[in-house]
């Protein structure tokens, strides 16, 4: 398999074939919390992709010099440093969105997707493939976030990226916003529906009966 095909597979596989949320059921908590608006879902996607990609890269770069007994601590130190950079950038340039994301930017440090890829892939692979793997898993995470955020904001407030898409009753239109879509349980059900849809079209992802 060529290098280009390997890169394509590493980036696209986590989106549907091995999605970190839909298949591995990781990172669900933040997916419930930051998807009330498409813009927060999009920014969170960029943040997690940035942290996952670079943490993978740096962990892989020094993997042969990390004592096995402290590898988790080293990984968390690298991830935490990158999260602090992301948090400071958001506060400097996207302060309103930073306030909306609240503690969930800081909680990227404990995100199972980020920690999982650093431990399972970056510790055993070269830096560039690890970087690409991080990008792919960040995009897989973002695919679910953006899809859920799209439906929650559209049907919850009739808007996308804060701009009115469905004419609201309050403004003389026909659409009555569904407040239920702005509550966390709606995200839970939407993610469940996505998992069902993906496994319907990809039955090989269904767990075998014991």
Curated annotation (Swiss-Prot):
A Pfam short name: Rnf-Nqr
GO BP annotation list: sodium ion transport
The keyword Chaperone is annotated on this UniProt entry: no
Keyword annotations from UniProtKB, A to Z: Cell inner membrane, Cell membrane, Ion transport, Membrane, NAD, Sodium, Sodium transport, Translocase, Transmembrane, Transmembrane helix, Transport, Ubiquinone
Top-level taxon in the UniProt lineage: Bacteria
Enzyme Commission code(s) on record: 7.2.1.1
Location in or out of the cell: Cell inner membrane
Entry-linked PANTHER family: ELECTRON TRANSPORT COMPLEX PROTEIN RNFE, NA(+)-TRANSLOCATING NADH-QUINONE REDUCTASE SUBUNIT D
NCBIfam families in UniProt: nqrD, PRK09292.1, PRK12405.1
Subunit record text: Composed of six subunits; NqrA, NqrB, NqrC, NqrD, NqrE and NqrF.
Name recorded for this polypeptide: Na(+)-translocating NADH-quinone reductase subunit D
């Amino acid at each position: 398999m060529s290098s280009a095909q390997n890169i394509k597979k590493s980036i696209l596989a986590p989106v549907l074939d091995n999605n970190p949320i839909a298949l591995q059921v990781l990172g669900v908590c933040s997916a419930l919390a930051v998807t009330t608006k498409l813009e927060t879902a999009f920014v969170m996607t960029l943040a997690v992709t940035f942290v996952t990609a670079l943490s993978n890269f740096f962990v892989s770069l020094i993997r042969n010099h990390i004592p096995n007994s402290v590898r988790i601590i080293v990984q968390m130190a690298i991830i935490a440093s990158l999260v602090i950079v992301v948090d400071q950038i958001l506060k400097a340039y996207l302060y309103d969105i930073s306030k909306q994301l609240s503690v969930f930017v800081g909680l990227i440090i404990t995100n199972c997707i980020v920690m999982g890829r650093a431990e399972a892939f970056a510790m055993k692979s070269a830096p560039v493939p690890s970087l690409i793997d991080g990008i792919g898993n960040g995009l897989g995470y973002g695919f679910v976030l953006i899809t859920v955020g799209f439906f929650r904001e559209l049907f919850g407030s009739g808007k996308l990226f804060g701009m009115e898409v469905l004419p609201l009753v309050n403004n003389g239109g026909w659409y009555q916003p569904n407040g239920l879509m702005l509550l966390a349980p709606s995200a839970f059900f939407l993610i469940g529906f996505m998992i069902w849809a993906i496994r319907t079209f990809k039955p090989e992802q269904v767990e075998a009966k014991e």
